[in-house]
Amino acid sequence: MEHFRGTTILSVRRQEQVVIGGDGQVSMNNIVMKGNARKVRRLFHNQVIAGFAGGTADAFTLFERFEAKLEKHQGNLTRAAVELAKDWRSDRSLRRLEALLAVADHKASYVISGNGDVIEPEYGLIAIGSGGPYAQAAARALLENTDFSARVIVEKALSIAADICIYTNTHLTVEELSG
């Protein structure tokens, strides 16, 4: 079976702003299947932003489950993330899903992994997907050495990742929340 792979999702938190951005490329082995996929979206009445890396169908399943958890817990990001992770670990059908979610609201940011882990990032920075290490390095350098806004850092770091990672392109979707 052919596997869809590759993407880059980056989240940066700076001052009263949190931004998640992602590229638009969907690849199957060495073929670009789509260049303008939307892997970042707003959830729960525009109070939460989220991005995914991994299998597209798997990620949409997780988005739906995560949004249901947000509704159930009235937008409490931490509780929704932990409850989704519990389900992910205990539900056999979910355990087979291959995706990572990066989620954020005004207060917190998390990576929710396929192992059922909920990870709060260091430095207010999340980078997942095939181009994640490149985007993370670029974003960290920009965070430490410039006064750029979180949005500018996300855009520049994703552009750098796209120059390096063959599974990442420059068709970006960027969402932000400001406090």
Swiss-Prot record:
Chemical reaction(s) catalysed: ATP-dependent cleavage of peptide bonds with broad specificity
Active-site residues annotated for this sequence: 7
Annotated residues for binding of Na(+): 162, 165, 168
Gene3D superfamilies associated with the record: Glutamine Phosphoribosylpyrophosphate, subunit 1, domain 1
UniProt-listed GO biological process terms: proteolysis involved in protein catabolic process
InterPro entries documented for this protein: ATP-dep_Prtase_HsIV_su, Ntn_hydrolases_N, Proteasome_sua/b, Proteasome_suB-type
Keywords attached to this entry: Allosteric enzyme, Cytoplasm, Hydrolase, Metal-binding, Protease, Sodium, Threonine protease
Gene Ontology cellular component annotations, sorted alphabetically: HslUV protease complex; proteasome core complex
Pfam families: Proteasome (PF00227)
Keyword flag Metal-binding: yes
Inhibition and activation profile: Allosterically activated by HslU binding.
Compartments it resides in: Cytoplasm
Its EC number(s): 3.4.25.2
GO MF, one example: metal ion binding
Family: Belongs to the peptidase T1B family. HslV subfamily.
Protein's job: Protease subunit of a proteasome-like degradation complex believed to be a general protein degrading machinery.
Protein name: ATP-dependent protease subunit HslV
